[in-house]
């Protein structure tokens, strides 16, 4: 939040790519309005959340039920080290857990999405370096309650997946600021 405040107070736009609430609070919206500066971003969804955002709609579209989704990441870079601390992991965990709730809506399909188990873990593993490995175990059920499983092993680099999004947002927020647009 300090960086967002400092940027806006100095008359500079602010872009956030991490899954936290830095720009999701009324005080930041008010400051952006007051300083006539644009703010953007929340979660670039470059790893496991990207997988969930892509695969959960398949489950919903096919009206498959969900019994559980277990996700774990191993990271070897500074992100992994920081997120290995429970206090630092909490915001990321909330973001990752809310992804399924926003796609597989229990009120719309209570028999399929009301009572599933969802667990998210991030582990620091220095040999992995800047690479990230995400493992997802998804327990689903189909017609007549027939149980099935999906296993996903996603090896990626956050920096490679995030860089194009970051560059696009920087260009867009610069264009917005030059055009006199501000706020969220």
Residue ranges and their predicted role:
Residues 40-42, 46-115:
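Conserved anion/nucleotide-ligand pocket segment
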């Amino acid at each position: 939040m300090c960086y967002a405040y400092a940027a806006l107070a100095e008359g500079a736009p602010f872009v956030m790519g991490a899954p936290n609430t830095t720009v999701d609070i009324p005080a930041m919206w008010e400051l952006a309005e007051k300083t006539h500066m644009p703010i953007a971003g929340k979660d670039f969804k470059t790893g496991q959340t990207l997988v969930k955002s892509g695969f959960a709609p398949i489950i919903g579209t096919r009206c498959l039920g969900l019994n559980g989704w277990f996700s774990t990441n191993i990271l070897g870079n500074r992100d992994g080290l920081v997120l290995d601390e429970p206090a630092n992991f909490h915001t990321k965990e909330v973001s990752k857990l809310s992804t399924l709730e926003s796609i597989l809506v229990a009120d719309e399909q209570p028999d399929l999405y009301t009572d599933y188990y969802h667990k998210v873990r991030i582990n620091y593993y220095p040999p992995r370096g800047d690479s990230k490995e995400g493992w997802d175990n998804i327990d689903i059920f189909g017609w007549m309650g027939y149980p099935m499983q999906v296993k996903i092993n996603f090896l990626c680099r956050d920096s490679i997946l995030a860089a194009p999004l970051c560059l696009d947002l920087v260009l867009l927020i610069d264009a917005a600021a030059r055009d006199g647009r501000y706020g969220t």
